[in-house]
Amino acid sequence: VGGERGEEVLKNNPHVFKMIPHDKNVKNELLGQHIDWLKRKYHCDRVIDLNESVECALSQHPRSADYKLPKNERIAKFNRNFYEYCFEHSKELWDSTTDFTPELFFDQKEMDEARKYLKPDCYNVLVGLSGSGNNKAYPWMMDLCNNIGKTHPNVHIITVGDMKCKILEDIETPDLTNVTKLSGEIPMRISMALTSMVNLVISPDTGLLHAAGCYPTPKIALYGHNTHEVISKHFTNVHPIQADEKLAPCSPCLLMIYEPKQQCPLSYSTNSSICMADGIPLQTVYNKFVEVYNAGL
């Protein structure tokens, strides 16, 4: 059972027999009863309810009693890998030999559609501009792209995100000429398919990063409120950059952030979450890009 996003993620998955669309009219407080009704209707032997399994259980919701725990206590209690926790929550046995690598499944039409955005004679870099929450956006991402374009003209940058990310794409980048801007222009599945084809993915904590985690594609992951342990511990070829606690003392907070302007300390320069704006200097990400780029030559 899932919504439109769930259908996109699970499309073509051979392990999924049937996808039941979530009824958006069901109130949150009645979800338990609704799922029990679906179990009976579809004659299911077992229910694994992932509602609030990670969100609220690990990422603390403002209504949670642990939301206001001191940071060190919060980290000690909740800095746990999401994939491992979902296995525990589902009462599935696992140990150090379990393969937690995520999987996506694309048909040939989707792969062909994604491939047409590549430039075969270039080093293709897929850049995710934002995540589901505004606090995940890295405000210097287009500046990073501009710097890369200035020093590495053979790099072709592909930017992806939702319609709101077009605002970021419109930032002036005079040295960035080898770029394809696709925010709001292509389906999420095509963005996810691209993570298997490009030379490098640069992304904050987003679905795009989890998609890249399915493949050995090198990836630079930017973390403000979350950590490498929580998100990408089981990914291969991942180069995590954690916000500097000296620059953003709140990071990592491991909290559910719905409204950064109410929940987060804000950067004076961008009026956005301090962990991403001030905690991750542009030069730090650029240096990591150069390191990964040179290693791949």
Q: What does each model-found stretch correspond to?
A:
Residues 1-297:
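Catalytic machinery of carbohydrate-active enzymes
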